[in-house]
């Protein structure tokens, strides 16, 4: 194997190598320091007289005397069923003190988006135990449903709660969680590890942790390692896999940092012009393949810079994914957990996974009525601030009280409270006792009211 010593420049995480034989895009590179230490890298760009290599580790010690060896293959992830229960670094190395992974296969981490013709229709309900998701923004198997948060909000706690509680009710199929955290602090990493071990959720999970002080380049690899693992578990071993990626904002910042080091022409707010395509190459790896037993469902979590939903990261994510769950600073200030605002939240595939035989026959009607009642109550709060509560009609006051009850009884729940879909819908019916039946009948069939309304239950 040839070793080149033609490094012309080191800029950030990048090495510029001159006069090499033809190499491939994304080819793996071994970097040999003067003291014999080896570091990993990958070909980022190539032309006739220059190759750009990104280093997966710190560039300390790299210089003109660094040896560069091109390995002739792309980054491959060693995968095995024994990965379940393991905690790995953002680069795929075990950090839980356990043995190295003995692979059944080595798979290219870049994978490929599912052929649209081969895609199955997502339809099976995934129960997260969180009412605001299960009841009004239902997650279905094979969907990609992001969570939009802001700095200082409890998105990490929500992510862990989903990882602990997610299941497909009534199904005997094997279920697994792949959890990938990018750009987190060491304190957050310890919190994640302790929670997984405390609750026993680690037994059915594979965890990847990329720390804030790890190289930015590794951050661009972490979600691909997680998805490669998920695809192996799903399509080769038949698992139904939920992939949680947090925080995609840190991933996009790494893209911007690498783009700046390459002196690329920036796009919106300094992010690379290809960020949409790059995000799509991650999100579109969710889904179901016809004829195969398993599935990959994604929940990417991102923090919106400045709580701005029009920022390029949430904006582009919204174009690719199938809805969004929005975490509200206002609800968080009220001390409500989880502070999920159902009004701007949406699950575009919800109707495929709910109803008779999947959740319950009243699910759609109850969801619509709760959404409508809460929206009207929130609008009335603005009116109360101007004219006062006493100026409202009796009907309007009931909707105002319904909005308060919705936040206090439906949205609010404990971080370890795992509600079934039946419990979630029954909470909704319990709140409907505050509204006149004439209002309920505008959206809910009379026979459903007589079946589920507490006033008619014996």
Swiss-Prot record:
It is found in: Cell membrane. Belongs to the ATPase alpha/beta chains family. GO terms for molecular function: ATP binding; proton-transporting ATP synthase activity, rotational mechanism. The keyword Cell membrane applies. The lineage of its organism: Archaea, Methanobacteriati, Methanobacteriota, Stenosarchaea group, Methanomicrobia. It comes from the Archaea. Disulfide bonds: none annotated. It is a peripheral membrane protein. GO terms for cellular component: plasma membrane. The gene is atpB. Component of the A-type ATP synthase that produces ATP from ADP in the presence of a proton gradient across the membrane. The B chain is a regulatory subunit. Gene3D superfamilies: 3.40.50.12240. The keyword Transmembrane does not apply. This is A-type ATP synthase subunit B. Keywords: ATP synthesis, Cell membrane, Hydrogen ion transport, Ion transport, Membrane, Transport. GO terms for biological process: proton motive force-driven plasma membrane ATP synthesis. Has multiple subunits with at least A(3), B(3), C, D, E, F, H, I and proteolipid K(x).
């Amino acid at each position: 194997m040839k070793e080149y010593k033609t490094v012309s420049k080191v800029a950030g995480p990048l090495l510029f190598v001159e006069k090499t034989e033809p190499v491939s895009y994304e080819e793996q590179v071994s970097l040999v320091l003067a003291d014999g230490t080896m570091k990993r890298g990958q070909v980022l760009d190539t032309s006739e007289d220059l190759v750009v290599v990104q280093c997966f580790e710190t560039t300390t010690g790299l210089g003109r005397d660094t040896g560069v060896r091109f390995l002739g293959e792309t980054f491959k992830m060693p995968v095995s069923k024994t990965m379940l229960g393991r905690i790995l670094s953002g680069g795929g190395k075990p950090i839980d003190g356990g043995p190295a992974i003995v692979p059944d296969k080595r798979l290219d981490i870049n994978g490929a988006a599912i052929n649209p013709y081969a895609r199955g229709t997502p339809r099976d309900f995934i129960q997260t135990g969180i009412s605001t998701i299960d009841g009004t923004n239902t997650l279905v198997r094979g969907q990609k449903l992001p969570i939009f948060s802001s700095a200082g909000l409890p998105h990490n706690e929500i992510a862990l709660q989903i990882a602990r509680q997610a299941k497909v009710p009534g199904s005997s199929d094997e279920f697994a969680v792949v959890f990938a955290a990018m750009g987190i602090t060491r304190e957050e990493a310890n919190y994640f590890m302790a929670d997984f071990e405390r609750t026993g959720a680690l037994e059915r999970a594979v965890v990847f942790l990329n720390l804030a002080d790890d190289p930015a380049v590794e951050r661009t690899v972490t979600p691909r390692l997680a998805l490669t693992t998920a695809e192996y578990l799903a399509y080769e071993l038949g698992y139904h896999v939920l992939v949680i990626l947090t925080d995609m904002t840190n991933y996009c910042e790494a893209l911007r940092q690498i783009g700046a080091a390459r002196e690329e022409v920036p796009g919106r707010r300094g992010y690379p012009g290809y960020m949409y395509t790059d995000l799509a190459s991650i999100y579109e790896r969710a889904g179901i393949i016809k004829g195969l037993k398993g599935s990959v469902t994604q929940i990417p979590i991102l923090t919106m810079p400045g709580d701005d939903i029009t920022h390029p990261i949430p904006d582009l994510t919204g174009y690719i994914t199938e809805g969004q769950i929005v975490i509200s600073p206002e609800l968080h200030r009220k001390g409500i957990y989880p502070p999920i605002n159902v009004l701007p939240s949406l699950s575009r595939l919800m109707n495929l996974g709910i109803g008779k035989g999947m959740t319950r026959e009243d699910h759609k009607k109850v969801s619509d009525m709760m959404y409508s009642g809460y929206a009207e109550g929130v609008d009335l709060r603005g009116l109360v601030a101007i004219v006062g509560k006493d100026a409202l009609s009796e009907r309007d006051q009931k909707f105002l009280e319904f909005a308060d009850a919705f936040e206090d009884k439906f949205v609010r729940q404990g971080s370890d409270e795992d509600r079934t879909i039946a419990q979630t819908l029954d909470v909704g019916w319990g709140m409907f006792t505050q509204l006149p039946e004439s209002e309920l009948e505008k959206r809910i069939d009379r026979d459903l009211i007589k079946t589920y309304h507490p006033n008619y239950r014996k």
